[in-house]
Structures are given as C-alpha cells and as structure tokens.
C-alpha cells in the first residue's frame, strides 16, 4: 500500500522519451485557462459557460461530449483545429440530468441516476441519429450518492457503480452517538447498494437485479476505469465523513480532516472494500473501524476481512472521473497510466483541499506502482478557500482524446479544457 505523504510527488524525469507532440495548430489559452501544468504541457479552453458538466467523453473523431447535471448532453466540435469548439449542440434535453457518459462501439452511452441509455452514433455524427435505447433500468436511487458512473471492459461488458445513500449506515445517520446497524441489515443493504454491477449491453434492456454483482462494500465510487493491459477494473472511492460528529470524545475535528482516505482499488470480482464498518487511515496506513461500529481510533478488523487500497489518497478530496491514458502524445512516463479528477473537499476543518487532476502511474504489466502526483492544479484559484463556492473551478470530468490530449471538465463555473504536450 502506498501514498504516505512522502509519496505525494514522484520523479518524472526518467520517462519523457516517446512523446508525440500535439498538433501545431493548437493555441494555448492565456494562462492555460486558469490552471497550472507540468513543463511542456499547455491547455486550451474548448468551451466555457456550460451548464454543470459532470462526466466527459471524446469520440474517435475528436468530438467532445459533456453530461450535464441539470439535464441533457452538450456536444462540441472543433472545425478548424485550434482546439476551441465552434459548433455546439444539445442532446437528450428531455431526459433527466446525470453524470456518466462514454462513446463506445458505435454508441453514445449516458446515465441518469437510475438508468443507462445509449444512442447509435454513425462515424462523424456530432448528434447521434439513433433513438434513445434503454440499456439498464431500476438502478437504485435514494438521492444521496445517486450519480451513476460506468465503464467498459475490452469484451464490451458494462460496469456500473451504485452508491450507498448513507454516510456509514448509522442510526441516526451523521448524528452524534449514531450506532451502526446489524450485520444482517448491512448485508441486506449491500445486496442493492454500495457496489459495482456488471452487464452485457448486447442483452439490453436489463435491470440491476439481472446484472452480476461484481464488488461490494463501497460508499460511493464515481471514478471507474478499465486497464486493458492487466484486464482489470480500477476505482477511487469517496471516503466517509463526520468521525468527529459521531464521537467527538474519541475523534477530533483535525482527525476527521486528515485521517479518512479516498481509497484507490483494483475492483476484482468479490472485492469487499469494508464500508460501512471501516475507513482507511492514510497517516498510520491501516484500516480501522468507524465509531458506529465500536471504533476508537485503534480498533482494527481482521487483516484479511476487507481489501486494503493500493493508494490511500488524502482525506475528502472527492475522486470523480477516472481515465486510462491510451495515448502516445504525452511523455512515456504517462503512457498506460490513469488520470483522476478530484472535485475537492467541502466539509473538512480549515481550508479546503483537493481541486486537482492527479496522475497514477502503472507498470508494464498494467498494475499501479503505488505512487501518484498532482498533474493539473490551480482550479481552486488564488490562495486557500473556506467553501467550494469560493473555488474558481471544481474538476469533475476527465477523458483521453484520440490524439492523446487530455480533456478536463469542471461543473463549477463550468468549462472544458484540452491539455496537450509540446515539450516547450
């Protein structure tokens, strides 16, 4: 396991061979559109003034799609190669808003909070000509942690995460003195929530109950991506809140602010990530019981009961979309790795943290090395902030383009950036 803070930054100097420069026609925006990047990287603002873009997807021809929180999908096309979208269309405006979106196997897929839809998209079509087709329905939705993100494996199987509408299944939830529910109630709850379900889109339409229950013990995972080298599913989980509220005698506010990691896992069939019973402490590098289940800051589960994270990211950073970097434009160090958008904290003590896009390197076998670094930063704006509303931007979406550019979306002061590499 990794990510003690000593691993916060790793050396990139060894991997800058093998990069393919971006098109010379791309013109960086002033100050890279308000974000900071490593040397040799630049950003152009593809589109601005959008309506709360959540997930981002890029088609093989470079068209960009953003799933909007308030409803519909924004479709963007750059016709002159300067990186800025000069054609904007809206899709699915009559359907509820959502978060998940992907271009896969001739279709544009997108989610609401309870369904997955797709529309057939012929090559070169900005607005898919196909009618909406229901792929998965009856995905559980109880408001809290209801967003549905998804990804595909190389065989075309669809993996959908169903979040847990709770902090830690305490009664009453998030309240002082809350007690955890029985093991039987936890098992019943996790049969419907807090896991990934696997579907075959060729068998559409299906319901959640017809899917294969792949993994369990999640609080909420929006960051899902498939690694084609290791043939494995990876995800970043949003950790729990309010340790100090549940039992302030044992957990101080500062403890809650720094000791509940955002866990990065390989999601194997049968993986159990330990929610609602536990959280992972990134300072002491260990899994501990939460106060609802007898936790006192020392009590730990049996070593093999729950899966430990590969990386324990800092507390409350809020991992959102995750993308596998399949391109060759960026230096070799980045090739075959993953980029993860962190939305940023909203309720931690003191200044808020996160608000970046981080890079996770993988080895030649498609396994995470356990290291990570902040790749794109500056979304928070100048100085520290006390509230997310004070941030300039909040990274939400991230996707790899066909030329190896990286696209980043913000749902606050909503815009999409295209990050490219020139080496200069």
Region spans (language model):
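Structural WD40 beta-propeller signal
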Residues: 49, 59, 104, 151-155, ...
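Acidic, glycine-anchored loop motifs typical of Ca2+
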Residues: 81-87, 126
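Residue position within the beta-strands of beta-propeller blades
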Residues: 65-67, 110-111, 159-161, 234-237, ...
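Hydrophobic core register within WD40 beta-propeller blades
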Residues: 56, 101, 150, 221-224, ...
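Beta-propeller domain segments
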Residues: 25-37, 147, 164-209, 216-389, ...
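Beta-strand-rich domains and repeat architectures in extracellular enzymes and scaffolds
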Residues: 44-69, 318-324, 340-341
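Surface loop/turn motifs at the tips and blade-to-blade linkers of beta-strand repeat domains
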Residues: 45-50, 90-95, 135-142, 212-217, ...
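Asp-box/WD-like beta-propeller blade repeats and closely related beta-sheet repeat scaffolds
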Residues: 102, 114-153, 166, 183
């Amino acid at each position: 396991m990794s990510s003690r803070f000593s691993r916060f930054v790793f050396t990139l100097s060894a991997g800058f061979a093998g990069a393919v420069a971006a098109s010379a026609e791309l013109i960086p925006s002033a100050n890279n559109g308000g974000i900071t990047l490593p040397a040799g990287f630049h950003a152009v603002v593809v589109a601005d003034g959008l309506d709360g873009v959540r997930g981002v997807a890029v088609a093989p021809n470079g068209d960009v799609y953003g799933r909007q929180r308030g409803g519909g999908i924004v479709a963007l096309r750059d016709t002159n190669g300067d990186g800025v979208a000069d054609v904007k269309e809206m899709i699915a405006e009559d359907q509820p808003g959502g978060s998940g979106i992907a271009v896969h196997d001739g279709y544009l897929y997108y989610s609401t909070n309870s369904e997955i839809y797709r529309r057939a998209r012929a090559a070169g079509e900005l607005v898919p000509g196909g009618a909406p087709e229901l792929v998965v329905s009856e995905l559980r939705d109880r408001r809290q942690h209801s967003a549905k993100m998804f990804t595909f494996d190389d065989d075309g199987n669809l993996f959908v995460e169903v979040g847990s509408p709770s902090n830690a299944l305490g009664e009453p939830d998030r309240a002082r003195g809350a007690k955890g529910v029985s093991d039987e109630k936890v098992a019943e709850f996790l049969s419907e929530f807090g896991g990934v379900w696997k579907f075959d889109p060729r068998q559409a339409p299906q319901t959640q109950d017809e899917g294969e229950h792949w993994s369990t013990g999640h609080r909420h995972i929006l960051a899902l991506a498939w690694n084609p080298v290791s043939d494995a599913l990876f995800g970043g989980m949003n950790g729990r809140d309010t340790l100090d509220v549940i039992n302030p005698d044992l957990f101080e506010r500062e403890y809650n602010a720094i000791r509940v990691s955002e866990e990065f896992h390989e999601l194997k069939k049968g993986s159990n990530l330990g929610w609602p019973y536990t959280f992972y402490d990134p300072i002491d590098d260990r899994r501990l019981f939460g106060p609802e289940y007898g936790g006192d800051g020392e009590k730990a589960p049996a070593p093999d009961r729950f899966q430990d994270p590969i990386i324990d990211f800092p507390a409350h950073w809020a991992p959102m979309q995750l993308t596998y970097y399949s391109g060759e434009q960026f230096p070799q160090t980045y090739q075959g790795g993953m980029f993860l958008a962190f939305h940023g904290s909203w309720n931690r003590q003191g200044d808020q943290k996160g608000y970046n896009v981080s890079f996770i390197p993988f080895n030649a076998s498609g396994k995470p090395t356990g290291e990570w670094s902040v790749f794109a930063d500056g979304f928070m704006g100048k100085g520290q902030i006390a509230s997310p509303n004070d941030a300039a931007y909040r990274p939400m979406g991230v996707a790899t383009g066909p030329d190896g550019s990286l696209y980043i979306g913000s749902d606050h002061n909503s815009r999409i950036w295209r990050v490219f590499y020139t080496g200069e």
